[in-house]
């Protein structure tokens, strides 16, 4: 699995296509052969997964109890908006209109490597979801990254 990192300013053309940044593209597993999965993010963004990474998530979702009403509601919303997309010879991918609307994308976009996935944002919305206060960021780092007694 590739490790996606970095923050990139990109554009979407009139047909809804974007060029995947070279650094992101180079980290896609060869086994996926230029095919990626786009889905709605929990926030107002689009999430891009390699097919290899998405299969791991799919396995978790498909292993849940289908007889649970709560699970079925989750599953319905999870699968809503998932699109398998192929990169063309120029490294472009077509963003479906429904996902463009979900993320409120226009011409300018921000692409953010997030380790095992990539987020695609409207630049203005992206800024709203960033922490502006360094002490708040430090508190979250302490909460989630500080060693536990087991370590």
Curated annotation (Swiss-Prot):
It comes from Cytophaga hutchinsonii (strain ATCC 33406 / DSM 1761 / CIP 103989 / NBRC 15051 / NCIMB 9469 / D465). Keywords: Cytoplasm, DNA-binding, Repeat, Transcription, Transcription regulation. SUPFAM superfamilies: AbrB/MazE/MraZ-like (SSF89447). Belongs to the MraZ family. GO terms for cellular component: cytoplasm; nucleoid. Residues 7-53, 82-125 form the SpoVT-AbrB domain. GO terms for biological process: negative regulation of DNA-templated transcription initiation. The gene is mraZ. The keyword Heme does not apply. One of its GO terms (molecular function) is transcription cis-regulatory region binding. HAMAP family: MraZ. Its main location: cytoplasm. Signal peptide: none annotated. This is Transcriptional regulator MraZ. Forms oligomers. It is found in: Cytoplasm, Nucleoid. InterPro entries: MraZ, MraZ_C, MraZ_dom, MraZ_N, MraZ_sf, SpoVT-AbrB_dom, SpoVT-AbrB_sf. It holds the Pfam family MraZ. PROSITE patterns: SPOVT_ABRB.
């Amino acid at each position: 699995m590739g490790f996606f990192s970095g923050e990139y300013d990109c554009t979407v053309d009139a047909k809804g296509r974007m060029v995947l940044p070279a650094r992101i593209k180079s980290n896609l597993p060869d086994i996926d052969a230029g095919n990626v999965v786009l889905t709605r993010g929990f926030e107002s963004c689009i999430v891009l997964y390699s097919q290899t990474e998405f299969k791991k998530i799919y396995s978790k979702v498909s292993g849940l109890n289908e007889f649970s009403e709560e699970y079925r509601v989750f599953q319905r919303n999870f699968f809503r908006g998932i699109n398998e997309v192929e990169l063309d010879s120029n490294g472009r991918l077509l963003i479906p209109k429904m996902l463009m609307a979900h993320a409120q994308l226009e011409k300018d976009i921000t692409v953010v490597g997030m380790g095992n996935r990539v987020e695609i944002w409207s630049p203005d919305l992206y800024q709203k979801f960033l922490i502006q206060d360094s002490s708040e960021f430090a508190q979250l780092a302490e909460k989630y990254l500080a060693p536990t007694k087991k370590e």
